[in-house]
Amino acid sequence: MAAKIIDGKTIAQQVRSEVAQKVQARVAAGLRAPGLAVVLVGSNPASQIYVASKRKACEEVGFVSRSYDLPETTSEAELLELIDTLNADNTIDGILVQLPLPAGIDNVKVLERIAPDKDVDGFHPYNVGRLCQRAPRLRPCTPRGIVTLLERYNIDTFGLNAVVIGASNIVGRPMSMELLLAGCTTTVTHRFTKDLRRHVEHADLLIVAVGKPGFIPGEWIKEGAIVIDVGINRLENGKVVGDVVFEDAAARASYITPVPGGVGPMTVATLIENTLQACVEYHDPQGK
């Protein structure tokens, strides 16, 4: 079986085009364009690349993008003060603080300081709690982006045995909640899981997010499984690969995401969706 490639680039562009049309309609109706504040502390090269892609995406869909590039020496108190200012700014619908933060700054304290109605990354305990209670509002971007991919490819997830490899707060844990909403029987594996291969071999839907190149061999994949590879790993030769051995897995799967060009573009597209949602649902005069 040769797997069908799930083209995240194309779907992400569709999502961004849909958002752009809605923004144009808002502005034509006399409403303001949504605003996103992107905060970067320090000069981590990978973070700078991620932030640049998010800013570019904002501008392409017609958002107001405001950048805050702070030095590595920024204190936690200074960062929290900036977040307080942005929370009170009526022209800003979403606040994104790029992780990781420098040593000495508490990630949890910073993320919890962002107002839940401006938490477009979906990391605030309020938004994670809403997802757990089956009443989601602003949803974590990567898991929601994966669900969008499955929906756009008309993949029926109800009744599937889904296995998530990795239990991070950013992907694994919220992904398990999204899969429950999508009707899956869901297993989350982690570093203490015994006999990982057995879990993988029984997965109708496999989502891998561990950040280790080639972590899941292709021969572990169940025939006809749907494989979603969240990993983005750069090898010494410069090649970017996922957590799954792609060629071998693609020979057994029914659908598979490539790396790059699979899940990654959907994370940014969902951030854009979340920002528009925050603007419309929370911050418009007629919003809830």
From Swiss-Prot:
GO MF entry, a single one: methenyltetrahydrofolate cyclohydrolase activity
Pfam families (alphabetical): THF_DHG_CYH (PF00763), THF_DHG_CYH_C (PF02882)
The keyword NADP appears for this protein: yes
HAMAP family xrefs: THF_DHG_CYH
Cited function: Catalyzes the oxidation of 5,10-methylenetetrahydrofolate to 5,10-methenyltetrahydrofolate and then the hydrolysis of 5,10-methenyltetrahydrofolate to 10-formyltetrahydrofolate.
Family designation: Belongs to the tetrahydrofolate dehydrogenase/cyclohydrolase family.
Subunit structure and binding partners: Homodimer.
Protein name listed in UniProt: Bifunctional protein FolD
The encoding gene: folD
